[in-house]
Amino acid sequence: MQRFFAHNTGKHETAIQALILLGAMLFFLFSPAKASAHPHVFVDCSLTFEFNDNGLAGVRQKWWFDEMFAAMILGDFDKNHDNILTPDEAKALEQGAFVNLKNFNYFTRILVDGQEHKQIEATEFNPSIEEGTLVYEFFVPLNIVDQDKHVVMVAIYDESFYTAVQMDPQNKVLGLSGKYKTNLELEPVSKMAYFYDQIVPEAAVLTLLPQ
């Protein structure tokens, strides 16, 4: 765990933000009001902005869970305990510990040119086991196809502190064609502030410049 920590020394304290995994609520009998004020689950999150021939298709997320939480979830879904998720096991895990996140926008907040992107969907969900820990991968479509300048901000957080999320300071751009030049940074975004505007999450900020 802490795969991004060494690259993020000196960053703002808000690099670690809250994410509550309500998709796993079958295993945690709590509500947000009952959650403790310090994290119990830790997630490293990396984002890849994916382009196709039309423009910015969307953002692929990859979450690595801490070993203790992963062991608990895999204990229920990796039925034969072989550290490989079969298609049936992966489907059961999706239904039992992921789909409920739809009710919470998958804890993903996106601003496009300062405006809220409200249609947060998740496709291509793929759980796996890497180096003994649980990994989620999924895709959030955006479909920005015009050739205007755009600024896209993506943050992963929730107003509960049950789970801490460490964002990758070196997120990626994939499949870029000659339509755009891009700049990608991880930085605090004050417009996303929450908890009485006292907490400012870090977001991956992608600037698209038409060529």
Would you name each region that the model predicts?
Residues 107, 111-211:
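Mature, soluble, non-transmembrane domains
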Residues 12-24:
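Sec-dependent N-terminal signal peptides
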Residues 39-64:
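Early extracytoplasmic/domain-onset interaction patches
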Residues 1-15:
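N-terminal secretory signal peptides that target proteins for export/translocation
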Residues 65, 89:
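Long, contiguous binding/interaction regions
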Residues 85, 91-110:
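Short, well-structured hydrophobic secondary-structure segments
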Residues 76-87:
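Acidic, glycine-anchored loop motifs typical of Ca2+
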Residues 30-32:
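N-terminal signal peptide c-region/cleavage motif recognized by signal peptidases
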